């Protein structure tokens, strides 16, 4: 009697990274189970997939966690009080431009791209998760602008909410433009232009 071969196995960690890249590139709704299984390799069956990851939604959430663990520090400078507020905003935008435009991974931001298509995902949990992540980035810009006002770098009349939204809009826009193929060299110059929004609100020096 022929000996039964061993069942095919797969590297779960590598499979998670592959899933992260697929979701990053195509979003939650547009990434199919067949695409995920093919990317994972090892001839993984549907039962094996569900045994390993429970569901597509659970896998997406885990992939987001992986993404944040690898790339989620882009906005940390916004909350670092030891960094000058203007410098913190500049660092965040520069880092985002470089990461979104370069590297051996899909272009753009997985969270920003996912948030724009979250309404069609059919999952309220995923929509809320992505919106929460986006909200934290927006809150970071707001906190940075508030520090600028408190430290006397920006005029007291500065509308912190509006300026924060302007920077957050540019931050999210970098992701879209990176996916459209705008090169980092161009984006880096655009970041310099965007910082003009901060400079326009700078408190005039006294004579």
Q: Language model features by range: what are they?
A:
Residues 99-103, 147, 167-185, 197-206:
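Amphipathic C-terminal alpha-helical segment
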Residues 12-17, 29, 51-79, 90-97, ...:
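An amphipathic alpha-helix adjacent to DNA-recognition modules
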Residues 69-72, 87-91, 106, 123-150, ...:
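Amphipathic alpha-helical packing segments from all-alpha helical-bundle domains
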Residues 1-10, 204-207:
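N-terminal intrinsically disordered/low-complexity leader segments
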Residues 88-89, 102-125, 176:
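Amphipathic alpha-helical segments used for helix-helix packing
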Residues 107-113, 158-177, 190-197:
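Hydrophobic alpha-helical segments that form the core
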Residues 2, 14, 22-58, 62:
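Helix-turn-helix
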Residues 62, 76-107, 160-167:
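Hydrophobic alpha-helical connector segments
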């Amino acid at each position: 009697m022929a000996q039964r071969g061993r069942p095919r196995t797969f590297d779960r960690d590598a499979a998670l990274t592959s899933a992260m890249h697929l979701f990053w590139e195509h979003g939650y709704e547009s990434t199919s189970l067949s695409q995920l299984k093919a990317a994972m390799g090892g001839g993984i069956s549907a039962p094996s997939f569900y045994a390993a990851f429970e569901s597509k939604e659970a896998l997406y959430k885990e992939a987001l966690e992986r993404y944040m663990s690898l790339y989620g520090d882009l906005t940390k400078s916004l909350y670092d009080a030891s960094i000058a507020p203007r410098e913190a905003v500049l660092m965040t935008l520069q880092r985002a431009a470089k990461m979104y435009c370069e590297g051996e991974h899909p272009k753009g931001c997985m969270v920003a791209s996912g948030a724009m298509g979250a309404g069609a995902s059919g999952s309220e949990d995923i929509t809320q998760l992505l919106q929460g992540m986006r909200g934290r980035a927006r809150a970071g810009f707001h906190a940075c602008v508030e520090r600028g006002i408190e430290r006397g770098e920006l005029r007291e009349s500065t509308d912190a909410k509006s300026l924060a939204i302007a920077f957050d809009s540019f931050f999210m826009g970098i992701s879209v433009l990176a996916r459209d193929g705008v090169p980092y060299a161009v984006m880096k110059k655009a970041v310099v232009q965007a910082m003009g929004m901060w400079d326009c609100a700078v408190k005039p020096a006294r004579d």
